[in-house]
Amino acid sequence: MLAPTHSKPDNVVHLTGILDVRTVGDVRQTLNDLIDASDGDVIVDLEAVDAVDATGLGLLVATHRRTQLLGRHLVLWHPMPSVVRILAVTRLHRVLNVERTPLPISA
């Protein structure tokens, strides 16, 4: 099960589980709330996300576009190898900002 949580000071959304058609609604709401409540870039911590389906990828692209329109960035942080492969196969790693180093402990 995906459990989106975020810490506003760091603009980090922590995800766990699978980002798919069943969970994308909750994640979309969390991301939109964070974007609306903050001014900085949005970081999505994917360290504990096992897989992302087409619906999840669509959400990431839509969020990327929304943050760009606001002059901000979406950063996908420390995705698991399975998610990195999906991003590479779909070539979204060329569009989305993917940071492969782990988040600092304080995040």
Where are these regions (language model features)?
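STAS-like cytosolic regulatory interaction modules
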Residues: 1-51, 61-107
